[in-house]
Design a protein with these regions (language model features):
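Active-site recognition of the HExxH zinc-binding catalytic motif
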Residues: 84-97
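Metalloprotease/metallohydrolase-associated module, dominated by Zn2+-dependent proteases
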Residues: 2-81, 97-141
């Protein structure tokens, strides 16, 4: 998901938290648990640079028609729960086609980044957070 207010720097070294290999192993475990074995998933460690200073934990790039996706994880996690971020991004991937279809319908009537569009995006994010907590069996976020 590209965004005009940020830059993504690829091919960076992991600064702290789980190693890139540890994240990949965790991704494979969750890929099986989430029944995403038909997806070709990869993981990249990146640095997110945002104009507003927001510290982003993760993101993804997906081609749902090919069932391919790359999960982007920050090189310098600060929340201490990379598993949560990883599963959160995987849930986004599962919802991505549905999300894009609904967003396209919304954008026929509303401007991108309008209050209505932002409400849609906020609601989507809350849904993904809620599903992530349920799947992980957590109530701490």
């Amino acid at each position: 998901m590209e965004n005009e207010d940020r830059e993504i720097i690829y091919d960076v070294e992991k600064e702290n938290g789980l190693s890139a290999g540890g994240l990949e192993e965790l991704m494979k475990q969750w890929q099986a648990k989430l029944q995403m074995d038909d997806w070709n998933l990869s993981l990249k460690v990146v640095e997110f640079k945002r104009k507003n200073g927001y510290r982003q934990s993760g993101d993804f790039v997906a081609i749902p028609e090919n069932k391919q996706a790359t999960i982007l994880m920050t090189s310098n996690p600060w929340r201490g729960d990379e598993e949560y971020t990883l599963v959160h991004e995987m849930i986004h991937i599962l919802f991505y086609e549905y999300d894009k279809s609904n967003e396209a319908l919304l954008l026929k009537n509303f401007e991108k980044f309008s209050a209505d569009h932002e409400k849609y995006m906020d609601t989507l994010e809350e849904l993904v957070h809620h599903m992530t907590r349920i799947i992980l069996g957590r109530s701490d976020r």
